[in-house]
């Protein structure tokens, strides 16, 4: 059994996907792909600061900043090529659903969130594992950061 709480922004995105037919879900994923912002210069000029998520079928790199403010807000940054719309779309979903949330809320997100989007029949299992790996990598990096502070 997977436990955890889906933050409100991410729950709304999941509901949006679940309210659509399968072809429309794919279109919504493409919309998220197109909306994924470019990296800020501090990362685009220094790609060595990004970590590759090797489980993704297409090249995807991520990094994050964990704030000093109460709750340690998490800010996510992704880089994926335009010719990888599925990967970019998954990154866009995670960015919109999790960016700015306190670290504890991100850590509490259930691991099955990718499956809740209703794309398992339309997207290959390997690509679905890529989104799961993105979420897992985000959580691991948060845990490492919190452990380093202790």
Regions from the PLM with identified roles:
Residues 55-59, 71-75, 88-90:
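Short connector loops at helix/strand junctions that flank enzyme active sites
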Residues 3-50:
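Extended low-complexity intrinsically disordered regions
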Residues 82, 104-109, 113-150:
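C-terminal binding/interaction regions
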Residues 33, 97-98, 138, 142:
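Generic structural signal for hydrophobic core residues of well-folded globular domains
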Residues 25, 58, 86-91, 102, ...:
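Amphipathic alpha-helical interface surfaces
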Residues 43-66:
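Structured beta-strand/loop patches that form or line metal/cofactor-binding pockets in enzymes
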Residues 19-22, 81-86, 126:
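Structural motif
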Residues 66-85, 95-99:
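Conserved interaction-surface patches within small, structured recognition/assembly domains
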């Amino acid at each position: 059994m997977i436990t955890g709480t889906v933050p409100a922004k991410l729950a709304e995105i999941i509901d949006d996907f679940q309210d659509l037919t399968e072809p429309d879900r794919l279109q919504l994923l493409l919309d998220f792909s197109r909306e994924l912002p470019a990296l800020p210069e501090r990362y685009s000029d220094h790609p060595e600061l990004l970590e590759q998520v090797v489980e993704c079928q297409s090249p995807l790199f991520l990094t994050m900043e964990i704030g000093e403010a109460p709750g340690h807000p998490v800010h996510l940054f992704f880089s994926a090529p335009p010719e990888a719309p599925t990967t970019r779309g998954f990154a866009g979903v995670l960015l919109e659903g999790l960016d700015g949330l306190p670290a504890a809320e991100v850590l509490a997100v259930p691991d099955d969130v990718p499956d809740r989007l209703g794309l398992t029949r339309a997207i290959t299992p390997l690509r679905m594992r890529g989104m799961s790996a993105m979420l897992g990598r985000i959580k691991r990096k948060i845990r490492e950061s919190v452990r380093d502070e202790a």
